[in-house]
Amino acid sequence: MPIYIVLLGPPGVGKGTQAEVLAEKLQVPHISSGDIFRENIKNGTEMGKLAQTYMNKGELVPDDVTLSMIRERFSRPDCINGAILDGFPRTPAQAEAVDTMLKSFGGCVDLVPYITAPVDILMERLAGRWTCRKAGHIFHERFNPPRRQGICDFDGSELYQRDDDNPQTVMHRIEVYKDQTSPLIDYYKERGTLVEINGFMPIDQVSAQLISALKK
């Protein structure tokens, strides 16, 4: 049976890092909704072009367009044993749509780790975050520094700091996330799949909590 995980947590909590740990442990891909958007837009797919028209107008991309792209990604051979979904769903309605989609693949959402940390820690983490230009790998000047300053350990590309990682924008992103995600947390709690993970710990200890949750 495939295993499907939805990873939740506010900006800066370390979802991307932990998703990679889980992906390696389970031998399934880490699928970020942001990466799916970028891939479809870059490749000029029908859904990518449609999404771009909404984005150009400053409008939200409709759920059916996003789900179509996610469905296509989940249908690829590397997802035969499952996948880790990050960045989507964000609302109960989207979660229901994901549930319906996964049923068509013979699976369901097996686990929803919700990684949390105090706001001041999230602010500190984001302010020191650097991102790989080529593949989006994330490093931190204090918590997870690259071996060579300014260079990605994985592909040797340049690391850069995103514009939205400044303090004011970060605080707004955290507040928006909490407001948007609260109903989603309740949705997964009711289904018994939500597991709260303490993200205010070293990376390996957070990973250990996730692995332990998988075994239950």
What is each stretch, according to the model?
Residues 1-216:
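Glycine-rich phosphate-binding loop of ATP-dependent small-molecule kinases
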